[in-house]
Regions:
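Short beta-strand-to-loop elements that line the ligand-binding cleft
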Residues: 24, 43-52, 92
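Flexible hinge/capping segments at coil-to-helix
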Residues: 5-22
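Hydrophobic residues within well-ordered alpha-helices
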Residues: 17, 60-61, 102, 115
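Short, small-residue-biased leader/transition segments that mark boundaries at the very start
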Residues: 1-3
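Stable alpha-helical elements in mature extracytoplasmic
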Residues: 10-13, 30-34, 53-56, 71-75, ...
């Protein structure tokens, strides 16, 4: 997770959120991570919740929140679609690394094999990196909106080491 705030706020760390209003989206893992970091850092901030990511970003954009804590790709997409993208930035430390997966029935070994083989082939051929670049780095038609989120080292590592680990394995230090 990253925090996104007004570009001139000077917020660069969760430790600087003491006494601030921090937005996140109801029902997301960001809520859990935010509370864990709040306790661990001894920081006291007020959590404000949006019912969806657009509403959470609006809390930030309208000044009702000082930061919005969410996945980097969601933050980048909201920034790209905002009225004034240069007013916002992704700032601060990554609060967690979470895997993204394809959900399917547990007993469908044939479908799992197709999914695994396809993703492995896309990763090894470089096509997966090209698709990422197309949707997260390059302008997206028809409005040529640019999300501007370069592939992270964690994502590159995930592509190089495809696995079936549960999310809990990523939280271990």
């Amino acid at each position: 997770m990253c925090s996104s705030d007004l570009a001139n706020s000077g917020i660069t760390s969760i430790n600087q959120l003491n006494g601030k209003n921090v937005a996140t989206t109801t029902g997301t893992t960001s809520v859990q991570h935010l509370r864990r970091h709040e306790r661990a850092a001894g920081v006291d901030f007020k959590e404000v919740y949006g019912k969806d990511h657009a509403e959470s970003f609006l809390l930030l954009e309208s000044g009702r929140a000082d930061a919005f804590v969410m996945d980097g790709s969601i933050l980048a997409g909201n920034i790209a679609l905002s009225k004034n993208p240069s007013d916002f930035r992704i700032a601060g430390e990554v609060l967690s690394v979470e895997p993204i997966a394809i959900m399917m029935r547990k007993d469908d070994a044939a479908l799992k094999k197709v999914a695994d083989d396809t993703i492995k082939a896309l990763a090894s051929s470089g096509e997966l990196a090209k698709m990422y670049d197309k949707w997260f780095v390059q302008p997206i038609p028809p409005k040529n909106t640019r999300v501007g989120l370069p592939v992270s080292d964690n994502t590159k590592a995930a592509w190089a080491n495809l696995n079936d680990k549960p999310m809990e394995d990523y939280a271990k230090k």
